[in-house]
Design a protein with these regions (language model features):
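Short S/T/G/P-rich N-terminal loop/turn motif that feeds into the first structured element of a domain
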Residues: 1-52, 59-69, 93-98
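Proteins with a high burden of low-complexity, intrinsically disordered sequence enriched in S/T/G/P/A and R
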Residues: 2-3, 73, 87-89
Length: 98
């Protein structure tokens, strides 16, 4: 079973998120995760509330939660919130057989 984390956010210039973007990949990989997709979503139906979406895959719920709760990632969350002025929407979807 695989677990997917969806991160949705409003547009913030990448220059404001330099520290976060330079370091987040290592925190994902250290928990067995990988980035599946990142960018501006294309609306097929409904209203798009976010301008950027990231989709991450982890091999287990424990790895996904371990990544999110890790001190290394939480330090990056603090820098991201400081740069953006608000938190983002992060959701875990589990039990995907691939």
């Amino acid at each position: 079973m695989h677990y997917v984390v969806f991160v949705r956010t409003d547009d913030t210039p990448d220059s404001d998120l330099g520290h976060y973007l330079a370091n987040v990949g290592a925190t994902i990989e250290s928990h067995g995760g990988r980035l599946l997709a990142f960018g501006a979503p294309t609306r097929l139906e409904g209203a798009v509330e976010y301008t950027k979406t990231a989709i991450l895959e982890f091999p287990s719920e424990a790895e996904a939660r371990g990544w999110y709760d890790s001190p290394g990632y939480q330090e990056l969350v603090a820098s991201r919130v400081a740069a953006m002025g608000k938190p983002v929407d992060v959701n875990l979807l589990g039990g995907l057989a691939v």
